[in-house]
């Protein structure tokens, strides 16, 4: 359900978030 999706999104952001922020700042 929605909570499972939120858990997946949260863990994905923890992995990908820093890299995405770095990429955004470099532009």
From Swiss-Prot:
GO terms for biological process: defense response to bacterium. Transmembrane segments: none annotated. GO terms for cellular component: extracellular region. The keyword Secreted applies. InterPro entries: Poneritoxin (IPR010002). Its main location: secreted. It comes from the Eukaryota. It is found in: Secreted. Expressed by the venom gland. Keywords: Antibiotic, Antimicrobial, Secreted. Belongs to the ponericin-G family. This is U1-poneritoxin-Na3a. The lineage of its organism: Eukaryota, Metazoa, Ecdysozoa, Arthropoda, Hexapoda.
